[in-house]
Every structure is written in C-alpha cells, then in structure tokens.
C-alpha cells in the first residue's frame, strides 16, 4: 500500500514549480502570429457558428479559422456507415492513410467538422479539415487559403520525447478547449516539470495569454498527479460560479473554479468522483434533454457516465475525494453516475437540441462511421439483434416500445421496418 498523500508539497518543490509556471506564462505572452501555416490539425472547438479553433501541435499554435456562413440545417440523422471512404475520396487518398483527430458540429448547421492527419507514405503527415453533412457530402477546407489568425503555444512539450516509443509527447500539447466570455481555455501539456497545464487566451487572439499548472488527487493511483493532462472538459455554472469540469485518464473527475486560473498559479483541482481504471475520456458534452442540464462523459474502454449538473454542483460543494478506491471490488468513489452503453466511440459532440453525433469504428470492417443518437436514449437500435427484430414478432396491445422502435428505425434509415402505428 502506498503511503498516504501529503496535504502539502515541500516548499522547495513549490518554489521550483512557481518558477516553471512563471516562465511558461512569459512564453505564452511572447508571440501572437497572424495566419501562420498549419503544420498539424488536432483538437478543435467552435467559438461561435463561424469561428473554429484548431490546435496545431507540430507548429505549437492555435489557429482561429473564419468559415464562410452556412445555411441553417434541418435536424436529421447521420447514418454514414463508411465516412472514411467518402473523406478519403475527397482528399484523393485511401482510407487507411487517414488518422481521425477530432470532431465537432458547427452550431446551427448540422455539419460535422473533422480534423485529420493524412499519411502520404513519406515525410510528415499532412493536416486536413473537412465538413460532412447528414447526406454524406464532404467539403474540404483549404487550410492554405482559409482566413485565420494564430496564437503561439508557449513552452510546448519537446518534439523528441515520446510515450510508448512512438507517441510524441507533443501530441498532448492541447487535449481539449472550451470558450467562455471572451476567454479560450486550453488544457494540455507544457515542457515544465509540473506538465499538466491550463492556458487561457484572450479571444479574439491579441497576444494576451496566461498559464497555470494543475495537480489533482487520483484515487485509483492513490497519489497527487501533476503530469497527466486533462483529457476532456467543459465549463458549467456550479453553485453560481463558472467552473471547469474536467476528466483525466483512469478516470477521475475534478472541478476548478475559473477564478482560480491566474497567471503563474498552481491549481489544486478538487476530485469529486472516480469512475474506475483502465480507460481514457474521449468526449464530454452538456445538454438538457428535458430532465435538467446533464453531462455525458464517454470513455475509450468502458460505458459512458451520465450525471446531472445539479449533482456535480452538490459534489463540488463538498470536501472532495481524498482516499483511494478499494481495488477491485469498489472501483468508484464520490459522485455517482448512471452508466450509459456508449463504449467504443472515438469522438462525440452535441449535434442539436435532440441529437448527439459520434465517430466510431465498425467492429467488423474497421471503417469509420459517423452516426447520430437521440439524447435520452443513447443507442442505435440497428446495432443489435433481439426479439423485436424477428419477422414473426408481433407487438402486443399498447406495447410501450412500439412508438420508440418506430421512431428509431425511421431515424436510422429503416422506415420500412418500423412497426405499424396503433
């Protein structure tokens, strides 16, 4: 058993840490570039309907791309079972040359924007940005010509450091972004010894930026951690205060009031939940499907966690989790969530008021799919074969599932298989 976690770090360590964070904040403020070329396209986030911020880990920059206006979209399902083939054709390459980096839905448009790395077979992969509509039409954004402004990411991780031999540490320079009231909040890594970093940029970019390092208590590992970055985050109003809600690998959930994000600060995040080991967050969205504001956290290797903002606020008002889990019988601690069967997603985003959009791999073919799911139901009926799917099955009178099955089968492109209405 590991020793108990100390409540305070040694003063010498805090001094070194403060120097490192101060140097990082100076580097962030040192440069502001207009229209720097994109060397990679990774994490992305919409600031508004016409402005998309793309993180460029190779170039150590953020790029705010101005998109031409888009016509308002009509709510419809994505039912694209091989979006990788359509994207590859538009980029004049093969599907196995594509690496899908991130996905976001343009507000009000029903258009999914996807960042990719395209491997030509020689040299550094090229960045790409495409849009996809619900009919499967792919639009390619010309990254060399599209209007954009750029901001430097100071003290990015070194390009020559790797995880597991071949994963550049610098790919985690930006892991997620969130916008609120003229500020862009950027999670990721720096090259400081306390590597987990939250950078805050004035937006539109004007050269002003701050940086704070982040530590959190990890109940699975039973230790304070200062290196592992935030993987997914969003901003919610908790108990009347704008607060960052953030998830880490393996899988603590923490809260950080935005007022604590001061330049050069070292933030002790409050751990409010432990959702279990052996997985990494891949998506976090907030929505109201008729039962009040909810947060859905999806993971790489386990079921998603659904929780109300009210419950998150209640947990944030308490002291927080400071003790380890009891492995393996009690893998969770703190805030309780509802398990939702959404394992295996690569990316998820709010599509509109009623739908979620998701990228996922087809288990049999390996093709990337772009699909929609209804908020509140969190499934695609056509993923499963069960009693209802046999040709001789008959719904009983007033069967509560008849209407839901009819709606979902129609949504997913199987209107001919929908049960007749009563």
Residue positions per predicted region:
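N-terminal secretory signal peptides that target proteins for export/translocation
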Residues: 1-15
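Sequence/structural signature of beta-propeller domains
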Residues: 33-422
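Bacterial N-terminal signal peptides
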Residues: 15-29
């Amino acid at each position: 058993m590991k020793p108990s976690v100390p409540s305070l770090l040694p003063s010498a360590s805090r001094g070194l840490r403060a120097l490192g964070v101060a140097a990082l904040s100076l580097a962030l403020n040192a440069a502001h570039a207009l229209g720097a070329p994109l060397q990679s396209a990774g994490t992305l986030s919409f600031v508004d309907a016409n402005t998309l911020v793309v993180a460029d880990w190779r170039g150590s920059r953020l790029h705010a791309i101005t998109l031409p206006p888009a016509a308002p979209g009509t709510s419809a399902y994505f039912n694209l079972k091989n979006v990788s083939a359509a994207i590859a054709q538009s980029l004049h390459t093969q599907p196995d040359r594509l690496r899908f980096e991130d996905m976001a839905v343009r507000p009000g448009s029903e258009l999914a924007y996807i960042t990719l790395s395209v491997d030509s077979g020689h040299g550094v992969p090229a960045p790409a940005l495409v849009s996809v509509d619900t009919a499967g039409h792919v639009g390619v954004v010309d990254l060399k010509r599209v209007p954009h402004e750029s901001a430097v990411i100071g003290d990015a991780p070194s390009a020559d450091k790797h995880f597991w031999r071949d994963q550049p540490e610098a790919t985690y320079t930006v892991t997620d972004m969130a916008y609120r009231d003229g500020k862009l909040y950027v999670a990721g890594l720096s090259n400081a010894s306390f590597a987990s970093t939250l950078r805050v940029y004035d937006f539109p970019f004007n050269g002003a930026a701050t940086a704070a390092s982040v530590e959190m208590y990890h109940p699975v590992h039973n230790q304070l951690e200062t290196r592992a970055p935030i993987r997914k985050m969003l901003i919610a109003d908790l108990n009347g205060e704008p607060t960052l809600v953030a998830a880490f690998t393996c899988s603590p959930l923490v809260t950080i009031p935005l007022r604590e994000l001061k330049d050069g600060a070292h933030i002790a995040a409050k751990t409010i939940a432990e959702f279990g080991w052996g997985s990494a967050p891949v998506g976090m969205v907030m929505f109201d499907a008729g039962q009040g504001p909810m947060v859905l956290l999806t993971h790489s290797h386990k079921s998603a966690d659904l929780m109300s903002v009210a419950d998150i606020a209640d947990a944030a008002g308490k002291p927080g989790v400071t003790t380890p889990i009891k492995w393996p019988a009690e893998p969770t601690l703190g805030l309780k969530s509802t398990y939702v069967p959404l394992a295996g997603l690569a990316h998820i985003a709010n599509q509109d008021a009623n739908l979620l959009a998701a990228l996922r791999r087809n288990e049999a073919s390996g093709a990337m799919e772009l699909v929609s799911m209804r908020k509140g139901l969190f499934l695609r009926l056509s993923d499963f074969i069960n009693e209802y799917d046999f040709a001789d099955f008959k719904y009983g009178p007033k069967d509560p599932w008849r209407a839901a099955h009819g709606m979902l089968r129609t949504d997913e492109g199987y209107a001919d298989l929908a049960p007749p209405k009563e």
